[in-house]
Amino acid sequence: RFIMHDLTPKQKRQARITALQVIYALELQGSNMDATFEHMLDTKDQSENDVFKYSRHLCALTSQNIDEIDELIKKRSKNWDFERITIMDRLILRLSLVEMMFEDSVPPKVSITEGVEIAKQFSTSDSSSFINGIMDAVYNDLVKGKEKAA
């Protein structure tokens, strides 16, 4: 498990954005995750190593859990054909949901807020509310249910 308590909120945001860039490249080019990270390391300040470690961790979690995450998105995107959701929105949802569900060091509400903020920066004007709706539905259905069961 990755420990990210040493990262500042700004570094965590950068890690999420870097992870988004990597999975975007993988989605469009089918390139290798390791090669994509190596290329990014060559072009970024090496002092960001912890940022890259967390980015790599998020990408790996996304890759390992993509089928489960996509099913969650499909079930909660009423009246939307999954394939018609913009690529960027799908990728932001995948990353944010993976972090919310599988990264215990991040409170679920932070994952939701980060997904919404990243959508405002990288996607369409309607994306942030769409992403917020899906994330909130998953949180209410699954995460809160886990907390009550515990």
Regions found by a protein language model. Give the residues of each.
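N-terminal interaction/assembly modules
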Residues: 1-128, 132-150
